[in-house]
Amino acid sequence: MPKGSGKVLSQNKKANHDYFIEETYETGIVLQGTEIKSIRAGRVNLKDSFAKIERGEVFLHNMHVSPYEQGNRYNHDPLRTRKLLMHRKEINKLIGLTKEKGYSLVPLKLYLKNGFAKVLLGLGKGKKNYDKREDLKRKDAKREIERAFRDSQKGF
């Protein structure tokens, strides 16, 4: 099964707009019981989340998991920091790469694979404003070409 396949529960669309994603890593995530139930219900948001390496471990910050509706008073904190599970070699490689200027770890997708929640983590370099404008121009041009092609096909 290729990386990132499975039932996608949440996607960080802004990540591809704000970063050049160079590499991706599939990571496990440590969750509490009410968190996984809420995630399976699709009540999760990756929009402003980011990953950080602290004390040789990778942690995911600002991922919002809504409290489980049928949960009791022991429900989880929606914005708590969650640990990501990776191999030591991968973590060591990421430590070296993130120390370089401009690289950061960005969660791209949250999905289920064989019953386990997985996070697709991307190693990205921040885009400048002119890069974003260039991407928008390229996307608009592609859309115009497809529209013209579709219109020419309908004419025949």
Swiss-Prot record:
- For the keyword RNA-binding, the answer is yes
Q: Which PROSITE patterns match?
A: SSRP (PS01317)
Describe how expression is induced or repressed: Constitutively expressed, part of a 5 gene operon with multiple promoters. Not ethanol-stress induced.
Subcellular localization, as worded in the UniProt entry:
Cytoplasm
**Tell me, what is an example of a GO biological process annotation in this record?**
sporulation resulting in formation of a cellular spore
- What family does this belong to? Belongs to the SmpB family.
Outline what the protein does. Required for rescue of stalled ribosomes mediated by trans-translation. Binds to transfer-messenger RNA (tmRNA), required for stable association of tmRNA with ribosomes. tmRNA and SmpB together mimic tRNA shape, replacing the anticodon stem-loop with SmpB. tmRNA is encoded by the ssrA gene; the 2 termini fold to resemble tRNA(Ala) and it encodes a 'tag peptide', a short internal open reading frame. During trans-translation Ala-aminoacylated tmRNA acts like a tRNA, entering the A-site of stalled ribosomes, displacing the stalled mRNA.
Q: What is this protein called?
A: SsrA-binding protein
Instruction: Please give the organism.
Output: Bacillus subtilis (strain 168)
Q: Which gene encodes it?
A: smpB
